[in-house]
UniProtKB/Swiss-Prot annotation:
PROSITE patterns: ZF_RING_2
Source organism per UniProt: Aspergillus fumigatus (strain ATCC MYA-4609 / CBS 101355 / FGSC A1100 / Af293)
Zinc finger (RING-type) residue numbers: 732-796
Protein name in the entry: DSC E3 ubiquitin ligase complex subunit A
Record-linked Pfam families: DUF2921, zf-RING_2
Length: 802
């Protein structure tokens, strides 16, 4: 085999991996980069020269930064109203905790003289965590002029006037992810401030629903729990404006000094970095965005509420001890960490709207007030516990699957199992793992995730796939037979001119020696040995090719479904929710293919009952958790209706399987709707062999059985019974014990109705089985025998699977 192409391909890949990834910038790029650095140096100088009160849009005071100039036509007239709502939320948070708020909070004119950084509250000093809460759109008191989008598009070279991140709808849900650490921090006698970054997902509650993702950077005052966040882009230099958005002069001074230090370090780092088209990198280590598009800018005021333990205000030293134990656990006797609670006001200066969280007294407590969520340490702990539970679920599923594989160790038992039932289970395992990895990978250690991934690989790609391949190979002849029946070969005319005489037969051997057939009517071995071997070899090769095609199709369908499912995150919320519920319904229908195969094959006991019940409970667990627990780690909206519907659907399927096991696989299927299949549990009735119709199933004359009746009709214990009903006793050739079977009266005899007789004998029929060759055995004996071979124990004739 020629491998020169592969060698050259690997050589090129090796060269690309070892080659330097950094290239000197082009001359035009270097000049643009120098101009960009000069502009940013000038902006930093202007920030250093500014002072508190320089930015006052109602007083016609503006800043020289992009987005805060007078001719930018932003709706800065809404800023006082947004700040008023933020002050109101601060007062409510202090009052609800049982503390007395400063009186100067009521008077906006007295705010500049207020020392907000000295307002010490019992709050978490590290605000890193994940929070969720409902929001409403605030109705503005007056109309403001619309943004001059044409001028902005011309200034920045945008190819469209459509703004992204324009939040619509009157209500929805906030999903806030706060991250501290790795940024600048400033500690002085007057207070403390540090950098913070956040990601805000805004979900609307309109009909289709939409979700917007906003990246934010800002400052956090740990002593008071106040946070100011802003977006940043080439048309809005939000980081330079942040200090001027503070409520008091002391907060301005702290944030002003912090940002001067941080932005100076960032600019120094940027001078040594390859060029980028993004005009400003917000924080050190933040991601850069090349080719920005126009979008709505946002400013967010967050206020953390004082921590309460069992509805009592916590002391500040206790809160510090809780935080210390969370970050460096040593087993200290501290109370469990309460959830973080925050109020939020979201203000868009260019798109002109205000969003705020629900709070008292405007909304009752039953509405789900404020933003609530665990600190990141608690969230990581909950996530790790969930992954551990998922690992336990996978381990239990693997155990049940191994038991079922051991039970279905013969071709007879494997032919009863539906391939699509096992395939749906494997699909579900793969989906559960991949989406948990996508959502919880940053919160859970690599070792825990590797354990879950290994168990899933074991369940899907090793044990499950091996079982599916065995089932697929065993059922290959059945599929080929169905294809032959659906596509019969076209008849070809004889090549000879005249047909043979009716009394003649084609001569196969012209020798004088006659052909003597064996008693079992088998053809001569020398004539058919070679074709049989050739046919067996071709059938085995065809089966191997069929299994390989199934393997490729399985992973192709899995890959396509994963791509579509990941793409569904970008769909409108309602459409994505409908897709997720439809996918869950299809996945939890894994018993439906088995029910259908039981009907087609007319078989009852295909799966172990511990496998059926165990898999049903284990595979329902993730759906019940995420759809019923409000504080689940993925912040999925509770939907008990869907949870109960999915659980009820699985319950119905299990009951149908149980009914098929007791009443028969086709008890609810009208006669003629399913293909004909042999019934191993016919009703025995008085009559001679001429009335036998074995293929029809249902009723079999007692005289058609090839067994010795040991009892007759004159047994003493049967004399008390009705004349139209008796029992017969036969020998089971497997266990050598007697079989006692009920025998109904012959047709036309006087007695009870056939409906009554059939109802009373439906359970007793399950104790015996009659083969197509008319031999009778105990059900348990013959089923055990048929697990090993599909031959009659007496006459060795082939018999169909149960």
């Amino acid at each position: 085999m020629d491998n020169r192409g592969s060698f050259f391909f690997l050589l090129i890949v090796f060269y690309l991996l070892l080659s330097s990834q950094s290239r000197p910038p082009l001359l035009d790029q270097d000049r643009e980069r120098q101009r960009e650095v000069a502009r940013e140096r000038d902006a930093l100088r202007l920030l250093n020269e500014s002072k508190y009160g320089d930015f006052d849009p109602p007083g016609d005071k503006w800043l020289p930064f992009a987005g805060t100039r007078k001719n930018d036509s932003y709706a800065w007239g809404i800023l006082p109203e947004a700040q008023g709502r933020a002050r109101h939320q601060l007062r409510s948070a202090i009052s609800n905790a049982g503390l007395e708020p400063p009186r100067s909070l009521e008077d906006p004119d007295a705010l500049p003289s207020l020392n907000l950084t000295q307002l010490l509250l019992p709050v978490y000093r590290n605000a890193t965590g994940k929070l969720r809460g409902d929001w409403v759109r605030r109705k503005l008191n007056k109309e403001y002029p619309k943004l001059n989008t044409t001028a902005i598009a011309l200034e920045h070279g945008y190819f469209t006037h459509e703004f992204g991140l324009n939040i619509t709808g009157s209500s929805g849900t906030f999903y806030l992810d706060l991250r501290e650490g790795g940024g600048e921090e400033l500690r002085v006698d007057s207070g403390q401030v540090r950098e913070i970054r956040a990601t805000l997902a805004v979900e609307s509650n309109d009909f289709w629903g939409n979700t917007w993702y906003i990246s934010l950077f800002g400052v956090h005052f740990p002593e008071t729990g106040a946070i100011i966040l802003s977006s940043n882009s080439e048309k809005f230099e939000g980081l330079f404006v942040l200090p001027h958005l503070a409520f008091s002069s002391d907060a301005y001074e702290l944030s002003h000094q912090l940002l001067l230090n941080s932005l100076s370090d960032t600019l120094s780092e940027k001078e040594n970095r390859p060029p980028t088209l993004f005009p400003w990198s917000s924080l050190i280590g933040s991601e850069q965005v090349e080719f920005p598009a126009p979008k709505c800018e946002h400013i967010i005021y967050l206020q953390q509420h004082p921590v309460t333990i069992h509805d009592y205000l916590a002391d500040k030293p206790v809160v510090d001890q809780i935080e210390e134990e969370l970050r460096f656990p040593i087993g200290a006797p501290v109370p469990p960490a309460p959830l973080m609670v925050m109020s939020a006001v979201v203000f868009s200066p260019d798109c002109g709207y205000i969003l705020e969280t629900k709070g008292t007294p405007d909304f009752p407590p039953s509405e789900g007030l404020y933003l609530t969520g665990p600190k990141i340490e608690e969230y990581d702990k909950y996530s790790a516990r969930l992954v551990f539970i998922i690992c336990g679920v996978f381990a239990a599923q693997i155990t049940l699957l191994l038991r079922q594989i051991k039970e279905a160790s013969t071709p007879s038992t494997r032919s009863r199992i539906s391939f699509y039932t096992i395939a749906l289970m494997a699909f579900g395992d793969a989906f559960v793992l991949i989406f948990i990895l996508l959502e919880l990978y940053p919160a859970v250690s690599f070792l825990v995730m590797a354990t879950a991934a290994f168990l899933t690989f074991l369940s899907v790609s090793y044990i499950g796939m091996k079982f599916m391949m065995e089932i697929w190979a065993v059922q290959a002849p059945e599929r080929r037979e169905q294809e032959r029946r659906s596509n019969p070969p076209a008849s070809t005319p004889r090549s000879t001119g005249l047909p043979l005489p009716a009394t003649s037969a084609p001569v196969r051997d012209s020798g004088a020696t006659p052909i003597i057939l064996t008693p079992d009517q088998d053809p001569p071995a020398e004539e058919d040995d070679q074709p049989t071997n050739r046919g067996t070899t071709s059938a085995a090769q065809e089966t191997r090719n069929d299994v390989g095609a199934m393997y490729a199709r399985f992973y192709f369908v899995l890959f396509v479904m994963l791509i579509i499912s990941i793409w569904s995150f970008l769909w409108p919320n309602r459409l994505g929710a409908l897709y997720a519920r439809a996918l869950a319904f299809v996945y939890l229908s894994f018993w439906t293919p088995q029910i259908g195969r039981n009907i087609i094959r007319n078989c009852r006991k295909a799966l172990r009952w511990d496998f059926v019940i165990g898999q049903s409970i284990l595979r329902l667990f993730p759906f019940v958790y995420f759809l019923t627990v409000r504080g689940n780690v993925l912040f999925i909206h509770p939907d008990t209706t869907t949870a109960f519907a999915l659980a009820g659907w699985v319950w119905i399927q299990v009951w149908v399987l149980a009914s098929q096991d007791i009443l028969g696989p086709r008890f609810f299927v009208p006669r003629g709707w399913a293909p004909a299949a042999y019934d191993y549990h016919p009703i025995l009735r008085d009559g001679d062999e001429s009335e036998a119709d074995l293929e029809s199933g249902g009723v079999l004359p007692i005289g058609a059985l090839r067994a010795e009746d040991l009892s007759g009709d004159a047994k003493d214990e049967d004399k008390q019974r009705t004349k139209d009903r008796k029992r017969a006793v036969f020998d089971c050739a497997i266990c050598m014990q007697e079989i006692e079977v009920p025998v109904l009266a012959a047709r036309g005899s006087a007695g009870g109705s056939s409906v009554t007789e059939g109802a009373t004998s439906i359970l007793s029929r399950r104790t015996y089985m009659v083969t197509p060759c008319r031999h009778i055995f105990h059900s348990t004996c013959l089923e055990s025998w048929m697990r090993l071979r599909l031959q009659c124990p007496i006459c060795r004739e082939s018999i169909p699977p149960v």
